[in-house]
Design a protein with these regions (language model features):
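Periplasmic/extracellular loop-to-transmembrane helix junction in inner-membrane transport proteins
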Residues: 1-26, 140
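Transmembrane alpha-helical segments of polytopic membrane transport and secretion proteins
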Residues: 1-6, 10, 209-248
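Loop-to-helix entry region at the N-terminal start of transmembrane alpha-helices
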Residues: 11-22, 72-108
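Transmembrane alpha-helices
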Residues: 24, 136-168, 191, 195, ...
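Cytoplasmic-entry segments and transmembrane alpha-helices of multi-pass inner-membrane transporters
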Residues: 37-72, 101, 111-118, 225-230, ...
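Short cytoplasmic-facing helical segments at TM-TM junctions of multi-pass membrane proteins
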Residues: 109-155
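Hydrophobic alpha-helical transmembrane segments of polytopic membrane proteins
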Residues: 177-213
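Short, well-ordered beta-strand elements
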Residues: 252-264
Length: 271
C-alpha cells in the first residue's frame, strides 16, 4: 500500500496542475460570457427567459455526456478546418473539456448576475440618474457594486461545480485528478481512487473557502477579507501551476494514462 501511495503522490503535481489549469480557464471563460449576459438579461425579460432557459437546459445534460458530446462536434469542425485552412485542432483533450466545463459553469453566474442587478433598489438607481449619471456610470458605480455579493455567490458555486466536473474529463483525453479515479477503478487500485477523491474534494474546499472570504469582504465592505481571499487564490494558483510548465506533453499512451491524448484529426502535440 505504501508503494501505491508513493506512486500516486509522485504524479500529483502534474495532475493537480492540469486540473487547476482546466478549472480556472473554464471558470474565467464562463465568467467572461455569463456576467455581461446576466447584466443584459436583467434589463430584458425576454433575454432573461432565453438565457436562463438555455443555461438550465445545459445543466440537465449529465457532465460526462456533455464532455463526450463535444468530441464528434469538434471532430467534424476540425475536418472542415483542415479542408479550409490546411490544419485542424484537437477533438480530444483540453479543448472539449474547456468548452463543456465553460457551459457547465455559466448557469449560477448568469442567474446570480441577473438576480443581483435586478434586485438593486430602484430608488437608488433613480437617485443616481437624478445626479446626472449615465447608464454606464450607474452600472459600474451603483448597480454592480451593490450586486457584487450576489454575483460572487454565483461564482463560488460555479467554481465548486467546475472543479468537481473536471474530474470527468479523463475519458475525453484530458489529464486531471480524475485520472486517479478512473484508472484506479479499472485496476482496482483503491489507493489511487482515494487519492483522487481526496485531492479533488480538498481543492474544491480550499477554493470555496477563499472565494467565501472574497464574498464576505465584498458584502461587508472589508478590504482585508477581500485581499486575503484574492491573495490566497493567486498564491494557490501559482503553487499548483509552478511544476506544470516543466512537464512535457506525452503523445499517445494507454487509456486513462497521464498526459493529454490526441485524436486522428487533431494536430500533433510536441514530443
Amino acid at each position: 500500500m505504501a508503494d501505491r501511495l508513493h506512486a500516486a503522490l509522485a504524479v500529483l503535481p502534474e495532475r493537480l496542475g492540469w486540473h487547476v489549469a482546466l478549472s480556472a480557464s473554464a471558470l474565467a471563460l464562463g465568467l467572461a460570457i455569463a456576467l455581461p449576459l446576466g447584466v443584459a438579461a436583467a434589463r430584458s425579460p425576454r433575454l432573461k427567459w432565453i438565457a436562463l432557459g438555455g443555461a438550465g437546459l445545459v445543466q440537465t445534460i449529465p457532465s460526462l455526456a456533455l464532455l463526450a458530446l463535444f468530441y464528434p462536434v469538434l471532430l467534424l469542425l476540425s475536418g472542415v478546418a483542415v479542408k479550409v485552412f490546411g490544419h485542424g485542432f484537437p477533438a480530444l483533450g483540453f479543448l472539449p473539456s474547456l468548452l463543456a466545463l465553460t457551459l457547465y459553469s455559466m448557469l449560477p453566474i448568469l442567474r446570480n448576475a441577473a438576480a443581483g442587478v435586478s434586485g438593486v433598489d430602484p430608488a437608488v438607481v433613480e437617485a443616481a440618474r437624478g445626479v446626472g449619471m449615465t447608464d454606464r456610470q450607474r452600472l459600474w458605480r451603483v448597480e454592480l457594486p451593490l450586486a457584487a455579493p450576489v454575483i460572487m455567490a454565483g461564482v463560488r458555486t460555479a467554481a465548486v461545480w467546475t472543479i468537481g466536473a473536471a474530474t470527468l474529463s479523463t475519458p475525453v483525453g484530458q489529464t486531471s485528478l480524475g485520472d486517479y479515479i478512473f484508472s484506479g477503478l479499472q485496476t482496482e487500485d483503491w489507493v489511487a481512487v482515494l487519492v483522487g477523491c481526496a485531492a479533488s474534494a480538498g481543492l474544491a474546499l480550499v477554493v470555496d473557502g477563499l472565494l467565501g472570504l472574497i464574498e464576505g469582504g465584498v458584502a461587508r465592505r472589508e478590504p482585508k477579507r477581500l485581499w486575503a481571499g484574492g491573495a490566497g487564490l493567486v498564491i494557490g494558483l501559482l503553487a499548483a501551476l509552478a511544476p506544470w510548465p516543466a512537464r512535457r506533453y506525452r503523445k499517445g499512451g494507454p487509456p486513462m494514462s497521464s498526459g493529454p491524448r490526441t485524436s486522428p484529426s487533431s494536430t500533433s502535440w510536441p514530443n
